[in-house]
């Protein structure tokens, strides 16, 4: 058990550090070849920070750990909203851009809705099993290309800001990229193997490990980024970071992962997909009312500004704790 836990922790740490070095090396190379900070942010950084979830998804799919593959994505999306934004909004009220409210949050909701529909072949088409096939993966990637087009269009409307990407020598940059990729591959393998061993030793489901420990571990970069953004009074970055990550998780990571290896869905995971949908709806309500409970139990009270308040943050964290309690009860 100690060895399995050490493998899991080491794997998550390697994933985080590997992604960091991959982004640093790739950004440096792009900068040296004249790529703008805007395009580096849209491509290198965005893709690099999603690499931990991608590697875990690919390794677990190839090794037949389907519950970890899907559980990591769904659990990460739930943790990003209820845990990450919950903590960030408790630290400081989180202001949300209008484009995020009306475009990106609904797109994040669309992503989890599409995931649930595509992952339920047995219910919708009465197939013997439910599976995310390679054709589903291609559809996810098609949605992802539309999302990239939207992001590029939105970012070009804004003034390009110097993001502080460091330009290093080519050999050093290649070294960062190579080591980063190596750490990601090793970290993904250790994380999945450790999670499988822990589930086996404790007699609990792989889905539970994927939805909790692995999901929270791969969400740590988003948590750190969002908390620091809240502390530095740039809380709008926190929401964009989380919502963008959730869209990436479904359309990009599930798309690539299922093309490499189809993934079967345990019907029990439908409950977790529903929680992911509910969490996104709660976020949408929060940015409109400022107080989730007023919207649910009384009536719609539209605010002129879009803010996630401290009360909302507390409610989100309580919902996440309740969800974890449900997972423990379910086993």
Residues covered by each model-derived region:
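Hydrophobic alpha-helical segments, chiefly the membrane-spanning helices
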Residues: 1-331
């Amino acid at each position: 058990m100690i060895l399995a836990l050490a493998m899991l922790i080491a794997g998550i740490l390697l994933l985080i550090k590997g992604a960091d070095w991959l982004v640093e090396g790739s950004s440096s190379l792009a900068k040296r070849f004249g790529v703008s900070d805007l395009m580096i942010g849209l491509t290198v950084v965005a893709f690099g920070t999603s690499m931990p979830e991608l590697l875990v998804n690919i390794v677990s799919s190839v090794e037949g750990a389907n519950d970890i593959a899907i559980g990591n994505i769904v659990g990460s999306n739930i943790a990003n909203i209820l845990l990450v934004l919950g903590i960030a909004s408790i630290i400081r009220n989180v202001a949300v851009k209008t484009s995020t409210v009306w475009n990106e949050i609904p797109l994040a909701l669309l992503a989890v809705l599409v995931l649930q529909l595509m992952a339920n072949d047995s219910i919708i088409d009465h197939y013997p099993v439910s599976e995310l096939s390679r054709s589903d993966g291609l559809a996810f990637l098609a949605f992802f290309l539309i999302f990239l087009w939207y992001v590029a269009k939105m970012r070009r409307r804004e003034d390009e800001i110097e993001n502080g990407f460091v330009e290093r020598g080519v050999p050093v940059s290649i070294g960062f990229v190579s080591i980063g990729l190596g750490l990601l591959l090793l970290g993904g393998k250790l994380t999945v193997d450790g999670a499988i061993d822990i589930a086996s030793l404790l007699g609990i489901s792989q889905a539970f490990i994927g939805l909790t420990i692995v999901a929270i571990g791969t969400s740590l970069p988003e948590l750190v980024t969002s908390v620091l953004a809240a502390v530095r009074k740039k809380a709008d970055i926190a929401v964009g970071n989380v919502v963008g990550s959730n869209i990436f998780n479904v359309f990009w990571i599930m798309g690539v992962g299922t093309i490499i290896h189809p993934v079967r869905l345990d019907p029990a995971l439908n409950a977790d997909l529903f929680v992911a949908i509910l969490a996104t709806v709660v976020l949408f309500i929060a940015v409109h009312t400022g107080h989730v409970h007023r919207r649910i139990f009384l009536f719609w009270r539209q605010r002129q500004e879009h803010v996630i308040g401290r009360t909302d943050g507390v409610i989100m964290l309580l919902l996440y704790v309740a969800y974890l309690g449900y997972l423990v009860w379910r086993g």
